[in-house]
A protein has these predicted regions:
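Alpha-helical recognition segments enriched in aromatics with Gly/Pro capping
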Residues: 35-242
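An acidic site on a long C-lobe helix of protein kinase domains
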Residues: 8, 32-36, 270
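The substrate-binding groove and active-site-proximal loops of carbohydrate-active enzymes
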Residues: 1-2, 25-31, 142-143
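Short secondary-structure capping/junction motifs at helix and strand boundaries
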Residues: 13-28, 47-56
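Helix-loop elements that line ligand-binding/catalytic pockets
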Residues: 216-219, 223-277
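N-terminal, positively charged nucleic-acid-binding surface of large information/translation enzymes
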Residues: 1-22, 40
Length: 277
């Protein structure tokens, strides 16, 4: 599993660099933060929001009155089986795992509840809290993670002390191929590194930016070709920037550009202003 994780991280990092993105200040690894996860789980047990059952530990969803506020789900409307983990050890079908008892062939760590591994929601809360504190400004992620992952993050992070976990949530739309979400597990995917071998990396960035981040994005060779043509136009615009800046009549364009960027980071709208100048 370490080898698989390393290979995936290397591929991600290489693509990140080719796109010209700045590296994150911290890139924490879940397996290096197990003690922090155990500590948070114990705090949830101590405050009455979690319970041990057969070596597993579950978060009691109904113990957190605000559960569902991000996804706008009502607890009473949620059904077992609707993206909810099944399990006979739960007090309530909606409860989710914070710690799972060890199974043969799976990674495991020692804990007060016996050997096992953390649930996939608690990892993010523990690492975010360690590096950003109990409350921070912006949490981003794919729109497919709103429920249950981000909803569960909020619950397990806010339940012990009541402080807001993240003040702003930015959820990006899915990247689709032939109308379906890309998924490596099914082979329905075009890798970013593969695409960057064919197209200018800056065209790749422009391809992403020309659609508002909350909307789904359709991958196609035509779309990337068009992004390269648009990139050429932007480079031409950059070359004539001095004369554009000297033209006072473009003050309205600058205001429109700023207004678009201030409107939920509407880069696509801001680029439209640039292309109209």
């Amino acid at each position: 599993t370490d080898e698989v994780a390393f290979d995936a991280f290397e591929a991600f990092s290489n693509a990140y660099d080719k796109l010209g993105n700045l590296r994150p200040t911290i890139e924490p690894k879940a397996t290096e933060h197990i003690p922090g996860m155990i500590s948070l789980i114990q705090e949830l047990i101590d405050t009455g929001h979690a319970y041990e059952s057969g070596g597993d530990v579950y978060f009691g969803v109904r113990s957190f009155a605000e559960y569902g506020k991000l996804s706008r789900h009502s607890v009473d409307d949620l059904r077992a089986g609707d993206r909810v983990e099944p399990g006979d050890l739960k007090r309530d079908p909606l409860d989710f795992a914070l710690w799972k008892a060890a199974k043969p062939g799976e990674p495991q760590w020692d804990s007060p509840w016996g050997p096992g591994r953390p649930g996939w929601h608690i990892e993010c809360s523990a690492m975010a809290t360690e590096y950003l504190g109990p409350g921070f400004d912006i949490h981003a992620g794919g729109s497919d993670l709103i429920f249950p992952h981000h909803e569960n993050e909020i619950a397990q992070s806010e339940a012990p002390h009541g402080e807001t976990f993240a003040r702003y949530w930015m959820h990006n739309g899915m990247l689709n191929l032939s109308g379906e979400k890309m998924a490596k597990s099914t082979g329905h995917v075009v890798t970013l590194l593969g695409a960057l071998e064919r197209w200018d990396p800056l065209a790749g960035r422009l391809f992403y930016l020309r659609t508002h981040y909350r909307k789904p994005l359709e991958f196609s060779t035509d779309a990337l070709d068009d992004a390269e043509a648009s990139l050429a136009r932007l480079r031409a615009f950059r070359r004539r920037m001095p004369e554009v800046v000297e033209d006072a009549s473009d003050a309205d364009a600058l205001d429109a550009f700023k207004a678009a960027m201030d409107n939920d980071l509407d880069v696509a709208g801001a680029l439209g202003v640039v292309f109209d100048v």
